[in-house]
C-alpha cells in the first residue's frame, strides 16, 4: 500500500492524500507536479526512475488506512534540470 507522503521532497509543499499534484517514483519518492516538471524533468533525482501521478486514496479509506505524516525533505533542495 502506498504511504502517501505529505510533502514535496524539493520545496516542502504540502501534498495531502487527495492532491492531484503529487508525483511519485516506484520507491515513493514524492514531489509536487511543479518541481517534477520544471526542476526534475519527470525523473526522480534519487533513483533515476520516472515520476508519475500519485493515485488519490478515497476519503472513505483514509481512516482505516491513513496517509503518512513523516516528511522527507532534501535540505539542499533539488538541482535545476540539466540541459541535454
Swiss-Prot record:
The cysteine motif may be involved in metal binding. It comes from the Bacteria. Pfam families: DUF1272 (PF06906). Residues 8-47 are annotated as: Cysteine motif. This is Uncharacterized protein R02474. InterPro entries: DUF1272.
